[in-house]
Amino acid sequence: MPGDHRRIRGPEESQPPQLYAAEDDETPAARDPTRLRPVYARAGLLSQAKGSAYLEAGGTKVLCAVSGPRQAEGGERGSGPAGAGGEAPAALRGRLLCDFRRAPFSGRRRRAPQGGGGEDRELGLALQEALEPAVRLGRYPRAQLEVSALLLEDGGCALAAALTAAALALADAGVEMYDLVVGCGLSLTPGPSPTWLLDPTRLEEEHSAAGLTVALMPVLNQVAGLLGSGEGGQTESWTDAVRLGLEGCQRLYPVLQQCLVRAARRRGAAAPP
């Protein structure tokens, strides 16, 4: 009897999804504390946005878009003397607005479309505070730039990945910046001999005693932001963590440079002669 080619033929055998699901009591495996997960970055993905970037770091996937500059709300303020370099005075400097959201399917448990609440607002504020030192807001008087970060999959170090992707999106949008911002996350293993792990996975974060996110402007060699939580022990322990995070940021910087160069070449090739 001839087969019915109009239908999609499924596999002859199937397995229940529980067979491949991770156990809830799974513990992180031992690994090199200085290793970085493989990173993939691409800028200029969204044609509707002024600038955009997509970043994968291990199992973490983030998409960022930049819009503006547009006139800020309440932007009709008085004028003042111009600052150095043709920038507007401090009272007229532009504003950077950052929004961080998680997709409903980003974690192991599905979230409500408007879920997240205070945690997402806190991460959005941390994103804004780390990006502001790198953006020349004085060149955009009475204007605002909007950065939207969407976490598609949370595989660990979500804030660090969002920071890096947002900086790429700002650069892709042609926003004037002093430097890029590179983010790196760390987690402290519990136990009698705690160790800081660079670029932890979601599982390592869940089993950690403390966490830290470092944001660096690598060319200027200036720290743009720090966000820590948990019990990290002595001050020397946190100092070692910051140093390890800064080294990780410097190692990631060449990947971001190549990403922006490739995006510029694609844009140049697509431009009409």
From Swiss-Prot:
Specify whether Ion transport is a keyword of the entry: no
Write down a Pfam family by its short name: RNase_PH
Which region is the signal sequence? none
List GO terms (cellular component aspect).
cytoplasmic exosome (RNase complex); cytosol; exosome (RNase complex); nuclear exosome (RNase complex); nucleolar exosome (RNase complex); nucleolus; nucleus
Per the record, the domain of life is Eukaryota
Q: Which GO terms describe its biological process?
A: DNA deamination; isotype switching; positive regulation of isotype switching; RNA catabolic process; RNA processing; rRNA processing
Q: Which InterPro entries match?
A: ExoRNase_PH_dom1 (IPR001247), ExoRNase_PH_dom2_sf (IPR036345), PNPase/RNase_PH_dom_sf (IPR027408), Ribosomal_Su5_D2-typ_SF (IPR020568), RNase_PH (IPR050080)
Q: Which GO terms describe its molecular function?
A: RNA binding
Stored SUPFAM superfamilies:
Ribonuclease PH domain 2-like, Ribosomal protein S5 domain 2-like
Region (Disordered) location: 1-36
What's the chief localization of this chain?
cytoplasm
**Location of this chain's protein in the cell:** Cytoplasm; Nucleus, Nucleolus; Nucleus
Q: Which UniProt keywords apply?
A: Cytoplasm, Exosome, Nucleus, RNA-binding, rRNA processing
The record's comment on protein family reads:
Belongs to the RNase PH family.
Subunit-level organization: Component of the RNA exosome core complex (Exo-9), composed of EXOSC1, EXOSC2, EXOSC3, EXOSC4, EXOSC5, EXOSC6, EXOSC7, EXOSC8 and EXOSC9; within the complex interacts with EXOSC1, EXOSC7 and EXOSC8. The catalytically inactive RNA exosome core complex (Exo-9) associates with the catalytic subunit EXOSC10/RRP6. Exo-9 may associate with DIS3 to form the nucleolar exosome complex, or DIS3L to form the cytoplasmic exosome complex.
Task: Sum up the protein's function in the record's words.
Answer: Non-catalytic component of the RNA exosome complex which has 3'->5' exoribonuclease activity and participates in a multitude of cellular RNA processing and degradation events. In the nucleus, the RNA exosome complex is involved in proper maturation of stable RNA species such as rRNA, snRNA and snoRNA, in the elimination of RNA processing by-products and non-coding 'pervasive' transcripts, such as antisense RNA species and promoter-upstream transcripts (PROMPTs), and of mRNAs with processing defects, thereby limiting or excluding their export to the cytoplasm.
Output this protein's name. Answer: Exosome complex component MTR3
